[in-house]
Amino acid sequence: MGAVPGVVLLLMLAVLGIRAAPAPEECHKLTKPVLKADVQNVSGDWVLVWSVANTTERWICENLTSSYVEFKLHSDIIEYTERNLFLGNSCISFYSNLSASTEKQQQFSLNNLQMEEKGVVRPFNDNGTVKFFETCVDCLSMEYSGDIGRFLLIYRRDGVHQNVEVLKAARDESQKLAECLGFSIDEPFIYDGVSDFCHKKSPEECHKLTKPVTKADVQSVSGDWVLVWSVAENISTSNEWTKLKSSHVELRIHSGVIVLNERNMLKNNSCMTFKTNMTAGPESQNTFIYTSGKMEENGVDKELDENGTVKFFETCADCLSIDYSGLFGHVLFVYRRDGVHQNVEVLKAAQDESQKLAECLGFSIGEPFIYDGVSDFCHKKSSPEVKPEQD
């Protein structure tokens, strides 16, 4: 019998639900790795939306309902936190540092991998390596290879992970990448778009509150801001800078760089000033990074070799919220634009919304800082003095 014409073969494959294997040139495009020199692009918070594994450790894949990953850059190290929620609301977290030697290296090694389950942290002995692939805007793919097997993990940036139709349309591309990397497609994990995470919820209300400001729209954060509400985690209460009376922040945009000048007045009327520059990668990126800063206290300048990440949220007109993660811990700052920061009743009414945002971001609400509406700032009074009328 003669050869089956190509068109007929394609029609047969379509009827049978079988997809042709991706062409080599398509694989070359899909498997372009992220180098160490460009690793800033992976920084941020990510939600697992699709995954396939060739492993003997099936417990890692079975009964998974959600997986949330944070990548934080610290000098040449990527700090990696993965939180996995399983059926029955049990959580297993993994912590590690990823490193690569040269700027052109595309493979990252895992160091000091640890697993936490039911509050108990123990070493997880697996010699693993990771490769990253950027397959679309706000997408990240990660190939993990170790003693326990191989995993392909497809992520969407937190905040754009809930559109089920978009995720469904992207599955074919995910399967192509898996085939290009030599994975056998068995029963992939597929995120349902609504399941919560170990450390925070993923409801529609949170989706609205936690819509981040991207680099393309960062001009909107420019201006002078007054801190009106704040909550912190993993932070030492003995730090003097936590004993706030008022905090005034100036944000200026210069060619894509955010210049921050923060003046904190403490309860003993001493002042502490912090200055830094923040940058982001692509226009769509919503995580801003700084690698150094300068702190001034009692007239003494101190260089801070600190790596931190910041996300901005615009929750209302003349409002700005900042989610900070870094050396000082994890802090949510809620601001009002200078000039509309003194109406105590309005600020009090907005506290419930601030608390909702904090809960959506995974904060446990302890004793928040609440601005009293009248305290002065380091460099100026909270409101201009009223001059007496002239006769």
UniProtKB/Swiss-Prot annotation:
Compartments, record wording: Secreted
Keyword Transcription regulation: no
Glycosylation site list: 41, 54, 63, 97, 234, 268, 277, 307
CDD domains per record: lipocalin_ApoM_AGP
Signal peptide start-end: 1-20
GO CC terms in record: extracellular region
Entry keyword set: Glycoprotein, Repeat, Secreted, Signal
Assembly description: Homodimer or heterodimer of PSTBP1 and PSTBP2.
Task of the protein: Binds both saxitoxin and tetradotoxin. May play a role in toxin accumulation and/or excretion.
Protein name: Saxitoxin and tetrodotoxin-binding protein 2
Naturally occurring in which organism (per UniProt): Takifugu pardalis (Panther puffer)
